[in-house]
């Protein structure tokens, strides 16, 4: 019960902060996701024991350049390819038997493109047709929240088969399927609304 209450309160706070930023103005939204990126990098740095603050400087420089300066689709595509490549490499590493630790340069590159690249493209999502689409980004987050919420409740109620115990001991296959199904339902209803 305490865990559900904690999750609910955290979720409500998160929703309030996000809604405030989205509906205040585009600059507030940009700033919020820049800060989210810094927070994620701080946690990544702590978990991987990456020393120094160069990664924060590199992230801020990359974020600023791509959000406010770069408009060339070739450069944007290049960053996207780098980000996707790092994601696929991490996925392959996750399912491999290797236990070779990452060196400092690898940690830096992973943090910059896995986290930094992800935050940059997340920040870009609502900017379509030279405008700021509040409801597009809200629709995406609604789908994420629905998926997360129902994955939790389905997993708690009928979940038996562990998904990946060494990474997340409590997550189950049943919960993941439940989250996916309800996310698709939410996406369908949101598709009926023009955003």
Q: What are the residue ranges of the model-derived segments?
A:
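Membrane-embedded alpha-helical bundles of polytopic integral membrane proteins
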Residues: 1-172, 176-192
């Amino acid at each position: 019960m305490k865990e559900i209450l904690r999750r609910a309160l955290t979720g409500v706070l998160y929703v309030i902060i996000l809604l405030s930023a989205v509906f205040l103005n585009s600059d507030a939204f940009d700033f919020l996701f820049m800060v989210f990126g810094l927070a994620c990098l701080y946690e990544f740095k702590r978990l991987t024991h990456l020393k120094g603050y160069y990664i924060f400087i590199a992230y801020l420089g990359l974020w600023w350049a791509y959000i406010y300066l770069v408009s060339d689709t070739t450069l944007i595509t290049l960053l996207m390819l780098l980000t996707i490549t790092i994601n696929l490499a991490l996925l392959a590493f996750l399912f491999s038997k290797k236990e070779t630790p990452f060196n400092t340069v690898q940690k830096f590159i992973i943090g910059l493109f896995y986290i930094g690249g992800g935050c940059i493209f997340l920040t870009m999502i609502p900017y379509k047709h030279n405008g700021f689409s509040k409801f597009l980004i809200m629709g995406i987050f609604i789908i994420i929240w629905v998926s997360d919420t129902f994955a939790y409740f389905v997993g708690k109620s009928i979940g038996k088969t562990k998904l990946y115990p060494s990474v997340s001991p409590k997550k189950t296959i049943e919960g993941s399927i439940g989250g996916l199904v309800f996310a698709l339902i939410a996406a369908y209803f949101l598709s009926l609304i023009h955003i």
